[in-house]
Amino acid sequence: MNVQGFQKLTLLDFPGRVGCTVFTGGCNLRCPFCHNAGLVRNPVEGANQEQEVLKFLAGRRGLLDGVCITGGEPLLQPDLEQFIRRVKELGYLVKLDTNGSLPERLEALLKTGLVDYVAMDVKSSPAGYALASGSEIAVSRFERSIRLLPSAGIPYEFRTTAVKGIHTVEDFSEIGRWLAGDSPYFIQTFVASDNLLGSGCEAFSRDETEALLNAVKPYLPAARLRGQA
């Protein structure tokens, strides 16, 4: 698998677990607020760290609980399942981060029983998806993934990074209607950096973010904020 880097310790990426995070190269979206621009546009050929990661994990058994696989978009990797099997053989739980654009691959992976937790990014409301994702992938593909997770039998979450200029309060009302139910949902704070895909992205203020949450809550009672100071 094309592993472009890994973080040896995270207390945040895998809820309730002490883990490490593996970053895969390449993505089929071009979200202007993406903070992993290098992984999306220019993954380094020949820089695969898969064996280094597996060796690291072999030496951390009993110290780490799980591995978060993120990107880029991990489901683009043709040998993702094989990598996960090797991680599971070492005794680790596996969390998958995905943008949900590849529902067939997501469904096939879920059926293997290898994944213990899935976090899916919901980029925006259906009407705002093209702007937020920088792509023309049919919204129906993301919706298929959204419908898969509640019946997968494993913990999961939906999450949206809130970005001023990309999202509005109405977008979040529509997201709430789209996801309506008891699914775990997080509105994440946008953090500016020098490694963004686009420009002009700004964070909402705390009060503005609370307004976004209030727009979602009637439809998603479990909605929460993540990353607010």
Locations of regions flagged by a protein language model:
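Conserved alpha-helical substructure of the radical SAM core
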Residues: 37-67
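A C-terminal junction/extension of Radical SAM enzymes
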Residues: 210-229
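Conserved beta-strand termini and adjacent loop/short-helix elements that scaffold enzyme active sites
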Residues: 6, 188-190, 225-228
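Conserved beta-strand segments of alpha/beta enzyme cores
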Residues: 2, 184, 221-224
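Conserved AdoMet/S-adenosylmethionine-binding subsite of the radical SAM
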Residues: 54-66, 75-207
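Short, charged low-complexity linear segments at domain edges
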Residues: 1-18
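A secondary-structure boundary/capping signal
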Residues: 23, 70-72
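Canonical Radical SAM [4Fe-4S] cluster-binding loop centered on the CxxxCxxC motif
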Residues: 14-48
